[in-house]
């Protein structure tokens, strides 16, 4: 009913659902379940216990909806996991498993996306034979084995839509246009699109600066909108800017398939700017959380000298002040060069440093949930209620609502595709800090499939100019691969460069997260294996190997192009022989 272009979106969504099922299986089976079954239970450690000051509101709906309270101190987030090398009677290596699953999900995603692109390119390599196109459709489209009336109606609609697509292709190939007017309108459209992108970027920058000011003054002093302003503004921009780009693209007079790619590119730039502005804001918030460590030094600061105080690192300051705090519980005093005796304290009463990894995971989960809710509300209001209004008020209105304003809505291919791609980018980027993200995304994709199918069939009308989509979804896959690469960079940066929080997460106590690999090689493998691994990871071997891979890719690409050219030549010869 709606053509191959709309069908390509749902095929892409189904493919994404399969990928996320694998990611969910890895994180759920190798990270969340082992920690829940074999790890220390809730309340045994400070990192697994809600602080005393938050216990009263830990089960409130508003707190849980914000993924704080008991949700924050659970297997859903990074900070809950303990740093023991082995847990349970199976001696399950939780830190190693957490690290390998985080790296493995990214590696698997790269492998499956590139493999799918290669398979699609291979299937599409023969090109499209347009000889006697309408004759082939007329005499070979019907399936004479159909015996069900509903199936026959669907097949009839499919054949009709394929004829419409072929007519559009034929019209576009014969179209004549005023080249000077077309160039002027396309330059104007690009200028308006750039102004829209710049305005959205400035708006996000302004909102991020406001959120940092709110964080410094204390978010508890502000309302719901101020606490969620960044997420809501990003969701609203993602909802309204694609519509504005769609209006701008009507000036350009491109082929519908090319217009869709321009639309995708503009929305891609919009979402990319939004995503990286959000990441920069998170990095600033991480630095802000790190500076909070110094607040621990206010208590009993007079107990250490100024020169000693300046020499202490941030984490040592927190640990030192915890020792002072434990001694002060019993009105005891300790010298500066000694440690406090072990004191039995309830984990809920122990002060703890900020866990920036959990904070990052919470932000990604909130953004994913708010984006999902915005999408569903948009479908409900923009599609369903609009269709109900047009359907029942058309009889008593001053003009024809079906063919005038507002009319029935069309399915927004570009906005939905880009929303799907960037949501997946957030899943890849945030799943290392929130193992629950793949599960949330599986639920989102599952409900979106049925909700959007229902909205398309019941509330939307086919596009005014139905066009034939490419037989391969490689344009979607290329954007997905680019987003995967960009989503990998922040995660790799935090793993390699930023020290993990010292009192939460499976890597606490280590200088860098990747040290879990060297620790495993040292304790669980013979010494010769560690030496071999060290030699294999030497840059002197890695760089030539990468160079060899690049040269191999260049050679295979050149060979593929030559095969395609030979294939086209053979097709031309076959056509010339057939015409004789």
Set out the residue ranges of the language-model regions:
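Transmembrane transport/permeation module of multi-pass membrane proteins
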Residues: 1-580
